[in-house]
Design a protein with these regions (language model features):
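N-terminal topogenic module of multi-pass integral membrane proteins
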Residues: 1-49, 142-147, 162-170
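Generic detector of bulky aromatic hydrophobic side chains
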Residues: 3, 7, 16, 29, ...
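Hydrophobic alpha-helical transmembrane segments and adjacent interfacial helices
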Residues: 14-19, 38-50, 66-73, 91-104, ...
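Generic alpha-helix detector with strongest preference for long hydrophobic helices that associate
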Residues: 19-23, 48, 55, 109, ...
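Cytoplasm-facing juxtamembrane segments at the starts of transmembrane helices
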Residues: 22-35, 75-92, 111-119, 132-154
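Membrane-proximal helix-loop-helix units in multi-pass membrane proteins
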Residues: 53-127
Length: 170
């Protein structure tokens, strides 16, 4: 299930980054955020039903992110509360980077686990930019767009695809 969600997280991060870099209309940007947010939400509710609470808890951080982005874009909402949510998630990415989701213990430093450390920390950096821009009111310019595209490719699309074909490093 993770590979499926990551594939769509990858494309939505890429599209959100391109939208920012190319000044695409926010309502247009909202559409894929609704799709990805809904997919993530539904699949993570399934994970809760199956008793996989760690996967669901971490996965819903993404689902709510994209649903909130979509709502902000469609309804032109004040972004400050979303910015505080971004800080909450960014802080959580620090310990999550070092927890093995299969054992719920501190990771062994295998190649696959080191990739997950880097992936979680890069996601945390992107969420932190939401707090910096929306709460602290510091415009980070094109950096966020480029970071979103890079995160989309290297932390979601490629890992998601590798998970789907069972080739992600252990």
């Amino acid at each position: 299930m993770l590979g499926v969600v990551l594939l769509y997280v990858g494309v939505v991060l890429i599209l959100n980054g391109i939208a920012r870099l190319c000044n695409v209309d926010e309502k247009s940007m909202a559409v894929f955020n609704v799709f990805t947010g809904a997919l993530s939400f539904i699949l993570n509710i399934v994970a809760v039903i199956q008793g996989n609470y760690f996967a669901a808890g971490t996965g819903l951080l993404f689902g709510f992110t994209y649903l909130f982005i979509a709502a902000r874009c469609i309804f032109n909402l004040d972004g400050r509360l979303y910015g505080w949510y971004c800080l909450f998630v960014a802080i959580n990415t620090i310990p999550l980077a070092f927890i093995d989701p299969t054992t719920l213990k501190f990771i062994d430093f295998t190649v696959g686990n080191i990739y997950w450390v880097i992936i979680w920390l890069l996601w945390g950096l992107l969420w932190l930019t939401g707090f910096i821009e929306l709460v602290m009111k510091k415009n980070l310019g094109k950096f966020v767009g480029y970071l979103s595209v890079i995160d989309g490719i290297f932390t979601a699309w490629i890992p998601g695809f590798l998970l789907l074909i069972n080739m992600f490093p252990k």
